[in-house]
Amino acid sequence: MKIGTDQYNTFDTMTMDCWNDRVYYEGKEFPAGHFAAEILNFAGAIHDPLLERITVLTALVDDLSTAEKSKRHDIAAQLKPLLRNTVSWLYTCPPFCYCESQSTYENLEHALSEERLDRDYEEEEAHLPYLTLSFCEPILRILVAIYNFCLLIRAFEMKYLRRLKRRNADAFAKAAHECFDEDDSFLILLEQMPFGEVEEFFSYPRVVTGFKYFQDENDEKKWKTAQRVICKRAIDFYVFDLMNGLHHGHAPSQCQGCGRYFLTTNGHIPKYCDGVAPQDSRYTCRQYGAMMHQKEQNKQHPVYRLFNTRTGTIRKHHQRGKISDDLRREALYLAESYRDKALMDNDYAADGYARDMELEHIYAEAEKRLK
């Protein structure tokens, strides 16, 4: 049997299988810490739009719970499109983006149907919309979990992980201890969370653990044992994945190019992710960052300093009408040729480059080319 299969994953139960530094969810393999890093891209600001979504939905669900029978249909009509939109958003978030979603939409329609609302009102002694509440509660808890986790772990990444000179399991353990156990400002942030008591953050997540047996992909005669972790709350799922990742030397980091959070799995100090660079879609952030770094280094290179000075003067002469368009074009071409030769030939760079880059020489050679 393949690892990561026959799991039960819904909005109120999340299951992952752990093997070495990998985790398996819905039959797919991920590095430990993947979900904790990716979810940071979905929320994290103090006044995040997610907070408004939580507030609006909570108010409507509360109204539906206490409303008279005659008013419940109108409230449900307001709640249903907002809830449908929220479910759609959740299915873009990890880990739910890897799950089947059709049954959830069907359950939503049934839970908020007029027939079901009327039936619950008549059959329930407290007249509560039982099915609606049982459907909405885990969704609201997930939203709060995402908001709380992202706000807190973004702060952890910025204040602790980002400053580390070494990125390994030992350094991550020390950073987690300093942040979660000793940092008063982090504890104050915990206390000030708008819905902190709903989905409380603990660095020791509450999970159910067991074991799962699976066949080796390379040799079906061999069987192995993975740890199965079951979480009844999304906050515990994300925290476990974060701490499991840190334990294996994996940690979230923010790309200096596009601003997205990504997972690092080695000891290198990260700067850029492998996503598409927003500055130029032809490159990844890593490629674009390397190119810009090289460009900055080039500015300090003696060959480039002289080249930039001369070409700047040529352009100014052209702007002031001292040289023609054709002479400008040929002069710039020659300057680039001398620069490239100097970069390839150290002897020329040390002796002939400065002489050839004199303006009088460049203009004289350019005029020869125009004849």
Task: Give the role of each language-model region.
Residues 291:
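A contiguous, mid-protein "functional segment" used to position or interact
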Residues 319-326, 347-348:
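Charged, low-complexity interaction regions
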Residues 267-288:
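Cysteine-rich micro-motifs
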Residues 1-265, 294, 298-318, 330-342, ...:
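Short helix-coil boundary/hinge micro-motifs
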